[in-house]
């Protein structure tokens, strides 16, 4: 069905299965296990003003019954809700309605509340060649400053290096001081011909690459940023300290941090824990346990120190970085780290 998710329901006789996924409804005969499309036509009339009024009432009741502080942070919820309700008749779209919800809920002065409108508007997607270019370059084409690791040009056959000029994309020349990204519109995952020039040797050549989408690009740039942070800490500490970044307060990030501090950084004297720009999750207890180890035993095998105990927690000094862009549990985790006196907290 090529759908991101699907729902299923069985008929009362248990002979057929109805599957709804994407924009299609299908029926499966369980005896033959074959899917057959179900064609239908339906119309629905929506009273959007009434729908928004219902949602307003729902928000009012949810906050009244479930807000964590029974005093509602000192806000008279009935009076405040009545003041905002009067704007409802004058709202005719969900964008403005989301703004109304955000302003209204903002009166409670608490995080994790608000309204958001996300319209589904199919748009063009600009691909990337996975390179960083020199914005000060004034000639034809684009001058490459750096090819991003694991990007489209990062392979053994490519001759691209710093200083290489991108002259053409799919045969189209790039005029001076022109944003070449317009030539990459809708080119993600599609073979693309790139004409290149080495101004030092005078060589011109072509390479076929497969541009990447923004999601992959952002992930590669993130890894580049973390790698640079680790290199800086390694340089500034003369190899005495390690560096890890907690991308999100979830299982994947925890496993990555755990692997690094007890793996390649196991013999370092200390660790820098970077939580900046983390969007949250729930990891504060795991981080507290991981970085609160206190050495109580050293295992010696044949006269050589083999490991310290506990061997599955960090027993050495650490320091944690935070910033104003941290959200949710990425704010709570640094608080726990500081409150438990696990180490110094640096940042706002």
Where are these regions (language model features)?
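Conserved beta-propeller blade repeats
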Residues: 2-18, 153
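Structural motif
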Residues: 22-31
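Terminal targeting/pro-maturation regions of precursor/exported proteins
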Residues: 30-108, 112-114, 138, 142
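Extended, small/polar residue-biased N-terminal targeting/export presequences
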Residues: 88-140, 202-228
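PDZ/PDZ-like domain segments forming the peptide/carboxylate-binding groove
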Residues: 124-177, 251, 327
